[in-house]
Design a protein with these regions (language model features):
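An amphipathic alpha-helix signature
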Residues: 21, 25, 38, 42, ...
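Generic enzyme active-site microenvironment
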Residues: 6-8, 108, 164
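Metal-dependent phosphoesterase signature
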Residues: 54-93, 101
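Helix-loop "lid/cap" segments that line or gate small-molecule binding pockets
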Residues: 27-28, 48-62, 119, 150-151
Length: 216
């Protein structure tokens, strides 16, 4: 069984899409830009908030306006990041079972670090040994920097670790970190995207994910 399970957050542990859309559309509105739909936001997420905004603004938007949208997003989202966000059904129970089995669980996300810390504490108190989000000086996924940071923080270099996520970014992150990857199909990417990214293990349910973790 794996000893350290490092999870992505958005689309893996939490369904955050509605709050991301709300925050994005608020920020876009400050510059007079049209709102984006839920399917559009679903397609844009995965590479951090700045990339989300770059994809969401109209083509040809200058850098100053992109920066203004980014600056509007963060204070709004800091207050509203949990308005509609919910854990995926069964995920809290899974984390509790892993804890009972002696597995250490952690989170590495491209979401802003303030939001990762807030949401992890609110929805999974006592269940995550460490969490790391996007912050200055640490390259975002698929670079493995934050994964290595969490492993060092936990003193877990000797543990058998696995990375779990819902996107092609997560598959690449695991590969770059030299870790096996378990992909989940209930998140923000369709199965064919995961397959095309090289996903080898794709779980469609919490039971399947638990089995994959036990077999690792």
């Amino acid at each position: 069984m794996y000893q350290l399970a490092i999870f992505d957050l958005d689309g893996t542990l939490l369904d955050t899409l509605a709050d991301l859309r709300q925050g994005l559309n608020y920020a876009l509105s400050t510059q007079g830009f049209a709102p984006r739909t839920l399917p559009e936001v679903r397609a844009f997420v995965g590479n951090g908030i700045r990339k989300l905004i770059e994809l969401a603004v109209p083509a040809g938007t200058d850098e100053a306006q992109i920066e203004a949208v980014f600056e509007a997003f963060n204070p709004y989202y800091a207050v509203h990041c949990a308005d509609f966000t919910t854990p995926y059904p069964g995920i809290s129970e899974l984390l509790r079972q892993l804890q009972a089995d002696g597995v250490v669980s952690a989170v590495v996300s491209n979401k802003p670090d303030y939001a990762v810390k807030t949401l992890s504490a609110q929805y999974f108190p006592g269940l995550l040994a460490a969490s790391a989000g996007a912050k200055d000086g640490v390259r975002k996924k698929p670079c493995p920097d934050a994964v290595f940071e969490v492993v060092r923080q936990l003193g877990a270099e000797a543990l058998r670790a696995v990375y779990i996520g819902d996107s092609e970014v997560d598959v690449a992150t695991a590969r770059n970190a030299g870790l096996p990857c378990i992909s989940v199909s209930w998140g923000f990417r369709d199965r064919d995207v995961l397959v095309n990214a090289g996903a080898e293990t794709i779980c469609d349910s919490m039971d399947a994910l638990y089995r994959a973790l036990r077999e690792g």
